[in-house]
Amino acid sequence: MAGPQLNFLTLACADVERMADFLRALGWDESPESEPVHRLFQGTNGIVVALYGARNYEQHFGPRADGFRGFTLGLNLAAPEDVDRVYEQLQGIDGAELLEEPFDSPHGFRGFSLRDPEGNIWDVAWKRGSTVTPAGDLTWS
C-alpha cells in the first residue's frame, strides 16, 4: 500500500489577492469554492493549493520568517522548451521575481528559480529521463 500522498498545500499570504493573480498567471484554475480570504486552486496531479491570510496562521503558529523558508515549490515540466516558455510567460507578472535565466545544469536539468509575491521560492525545471504526463504525473528517473 502506498503511503499518504501530498495533495493539499496551504500558503500563508500577506496579500491573498496578489498571490491569486500570480497563480492565475501561471494558468492554474481557481475553484468556485474560493472566498476572498481563502482561495483554492486546482493544480495538476490532483494537488490543491490554498491561499490563506497570513494573520490566521501567525495567531496560531507565531510570526512568519523572512528570507528563505527552508523549502522550494517545484514545477516540473515535460520538455526543456517548456522551461523557456514558462520563463517568458512569467516576465512582467506582478510579484514574480525571476532570480535567474533558464540554464542547463551538468546533472541533466534545464531550469530557473523565481520568488513569488509572498517570498516563496519556486524551481521550474525539466529533468532528462523523467516524464510528466498531460495530467501532471511526474515519474522521476
Named regions from a protein language model:
Residues 56-62, 131-133:
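A short, acidic/glycine-rich surface segment
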Residues 26-27, 81, 94:
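Structural motif
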Residues 20, 59, 84, 122:
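Alpha-helical elements of the RecA-like P-loop NTPase motor core of helicases
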Residues 1-21, 73-75, 127-141:
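N-terminal beta-strand motif that seeds the catalytic metal site of vicinal oxygen chelate
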Residues 21-25, 86-91:
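Short amphipathic alpha-helices in soluble, non-transmembrane regions
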Residues 10-57:
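Core segments of cupin and vicinal oxygen chelate
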Residues 2, 5-14, 41-42, 62-141:
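Vicinal oxygen chelate
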